[in-house]
């Protein structure tokens, strides 16, 4: 890289990082500004989502009352920005409103103490009380009742959907949830007039639920990354991903987008959903205005209405690689001035390396690209302190080979197993694997993580070879983050804490390297843990699987060194036992009679 080019790049990069592309005008009334920008419909939806994410146990009607009061106040401020209290910050206005809830102390306990604090400490306090695993009932589709409610009052029906999703996912990306609510509305608009509402709705709602869970997991990873690793780590993640998506965009352009995308997500993670949605709309506008220099895949997105446009941009496929990309070694391994460039502007130089490497490798996962950049940085730190730096860093690219081979080998091994046994048994293998790594973790969490990891096989193993690695490791990052988030609330394993907090890039290899926990004292065998009743026969298939998989995790906790064959025998016996008794006329009598025999034979098989 010629030095004059690097200087101009440094100027562009620094300018982009300090300014970004979003407007940052000051307004007399923040709430009036956001109300005018977003419009009443989106304003109300986002305030409802924000309040539901903070107070997850409050009834829907209570939240609607708060939202209506805030909306009326916003209208007053929009009409006269100098009206009383209109100059207060959104955190102050929303926090004051939340603190008026009469049942705050009784329902939320310590959260009520937040109301004694001043901003910004009060909002930070509210954030720490968000519950990633709230004790809320499972939502089940009831097509007839739901269609009646939808036709009677569509706005209330969609508001209830926003509320139910938001309180179960307290870090859900606010503006994206508005998009999913439109999908939800479209599903009911299509299916409610159908003769068989159930047959029409169920597949659509199941598919929407999967998209919701994925979207929630993606945003939770961003919010956790801000909290545990800081803004620099989030920006590095985004540089790698956007460089893969937009390989034709230059580094300064990618940097600008990363800066503002980071701002958008930081706002949403901090509960600032109105600013987040407003800034996201501005960023989508900027990207579409500059699409010619960013990506050839954006045109279809940019023709859509706002919510669909932003969603489409976020999900857009990687653009085609430019055909004239030069080899990287010349600039990053052979140039004699590398140490000078690195010392003069470390973040810019490393950012440039990450951008250049990532745009050439859509076949790598983001965390692999970050591990490569981390290795490159460590090599420069070492070599630039030596007598002959160029001789030292000349072979740096050779160090990347084992970093690439490790996840490729892991993906092949896991996909081979998935293709051999199918999703359910693949999940079982992962539940066993992770229970052995961290037997102290609660059984419901281990089963949830094992099932999620198992679904990665279905999602990724059928893809072409070039897409398997990024698909697998990017989705593994989401599942492992869920484990880390749940473990952070109730930490039980120092090894898990270390993997979760040491390094975002190294998190997956850290978990992969965990072995059987030799210091774990096995759980005592309790017959009631493996006692089942006739109600299992009428459960939906996924709930039946969870019951069996919970028993499997408990078996491993009882016998961590049980062999694969032993566990397979016991699980096979258990499945046969359930099938046998569910086929009997007097199911409960069968469970009562055969259950103790199963427990005894299981103990014997594991002895």
Curated annotation (Swiss-Prot):
Annotated positions of the N6-methyllysine modification: 557
GO biological process terms held by the UniProt record: cellular response to calcium ion starvation; cellular response to starvation; negative regulation of mitochondrial depolarization
Binding site for Zn(2+): 91, 270, 272
Gene Ontology cellular component list: cytoplasm; extracellular space; protein-containing complex
Post-translational modification note: Phosphorylated by FAM20C in the extracellular medium.
Sites of N6-succinyllysine modification: 587
Biological function: Binds water, Ca(2+), Na(+), K(+), fatty acids, hormones, bilirubin and drugs. Its main function is the regulation of the colloidal osmotic pressure of blood. Major zinc transporter in plasma, typically binds about 80% of all plasma zinc. Major calcium and magnesium transporter in plasma, binds approximately 45% of circulating calcium and magnesium in plasma. Potentially has more than two calcium-binding sites and might additionally bind calcium in a non-specific manner.
This protein's name: Albumin
Originating species: Equus caballus
Gene: ALB
């Amino acid at each position: 890289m010629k030095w004059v080019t690097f200087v101009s790049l440094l100027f562009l990069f620094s300018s982009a990082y300090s300014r970004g592309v979003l407007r940052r005008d000051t307004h007399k009334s923040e709430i009036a500004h956001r109300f005018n920008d977003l419009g009443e419909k989106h304003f109300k939806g986002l305030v409802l989502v924000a309040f539901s994410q903070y107070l997850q146990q409050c009834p829907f009607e209570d939240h609607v009352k708060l939202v209506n009061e805030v909306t009326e106040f916003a209208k007053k401020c929009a009409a006269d920005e100098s009206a009383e209290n209109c100059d207060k910050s959104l955190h102050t206005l929303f926090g004051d409103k939340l603190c008026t809830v009469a049942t705050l102390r009784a329902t939320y306990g310590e959260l009520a103490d937040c109301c004694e604090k001043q901003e910004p400490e009060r909002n930070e306090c509210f954030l720490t009380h968000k519950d990633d695993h709230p004790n809320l009932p499972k939502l089940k589709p009831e097509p007839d009742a739901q269609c009646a409610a939808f036709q009677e009052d569509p706005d209330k029906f969609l508001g209830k959907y926003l509320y139910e999703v938001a309180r179960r996912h307290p870090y859900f990306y606010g503006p994206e949830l508005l998009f999913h609510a439109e999908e939800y509305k479209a599903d009911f608009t299509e299916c409610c007039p159908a003769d068989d509402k159930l047959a029409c709705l169920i597949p659509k709602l199941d598919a929407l639920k999967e998209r919701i869970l994925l979207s929630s997991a993606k945003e939770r990873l961003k919010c956790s990354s801000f909290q545990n690793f800081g803004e620099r780590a989030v920006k590095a993640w985004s540089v790698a991903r956007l460089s893969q998506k937009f390989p034709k965009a230059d580094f300064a352009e990618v940097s600008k987008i990363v800066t503002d995308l980071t701002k958008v997500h930081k706002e949403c993670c901090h509960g600032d959903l109105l600013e987040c949605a407003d800034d996201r709309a501005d960023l989508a506008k900027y990207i579409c205005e500059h699409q010619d220099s960013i990506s050839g895949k954006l045109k279809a997105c940019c023709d859509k209405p706002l919510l669909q446009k932003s969603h489409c941009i976020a999900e857009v496929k990687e653009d085609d690689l430019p055909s004239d990309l030069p080899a990287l070694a010349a600039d990053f391994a052979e140039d004699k001035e590398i140490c000078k460039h690195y010392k003069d502007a470390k973040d810019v130089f490393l950012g440039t390396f990450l951008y250049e490497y990532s745009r050439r490798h859509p076949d790598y996962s983001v965390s692999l690209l970050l591990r490569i950049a981390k290795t490159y940085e460590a090599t420069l730190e070492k070599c630039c302190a030596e007598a002959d730096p160029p001789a030292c860093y000349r072979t740096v690219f050779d160090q990347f080979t084992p970093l690439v081979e490790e996840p490729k080998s892991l993906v092949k091994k896991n996909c081979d197993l998935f293709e051999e046994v199918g999703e359910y048994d693949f999940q079982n293998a992962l539940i066993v694997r992770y229970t052995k790594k961290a037997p102290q973790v609660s059984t419901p969490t281990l089963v949830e993580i094992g099932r999620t990891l198992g679904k990665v096989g279905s999602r990724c193993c059928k893809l072409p070879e070039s897409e398997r690695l990024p698909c697998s490791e990017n989705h593994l990052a989401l599942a492992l983050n869920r484990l880390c988030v749940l473990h952070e609330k109730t930490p039980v394993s120092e090894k898990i804490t270390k993997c979760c907090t040491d390094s975002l890039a190294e998190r997956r290899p850290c978990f992969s390297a965990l072995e059987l926990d030799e210091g774990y004292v096995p759980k005592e065998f309790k017959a009631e843990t493996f006692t089942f009743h006739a109600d299992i026969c009428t459960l939906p298939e996924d709930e039946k699987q969870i019951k069996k998989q919970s028993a499997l995790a408990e078996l491993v906790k009882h016998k961590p060194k049980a062999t694969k064959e032993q566990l397979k025998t016991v699980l096979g016996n258990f499945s046969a036992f359930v099938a046998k008794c569910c086929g009997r006329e007097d199911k409960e009598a069968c469970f009562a009679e055969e259950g103790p025999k199963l427990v005894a034979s299981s103990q014997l098989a594991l002895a």
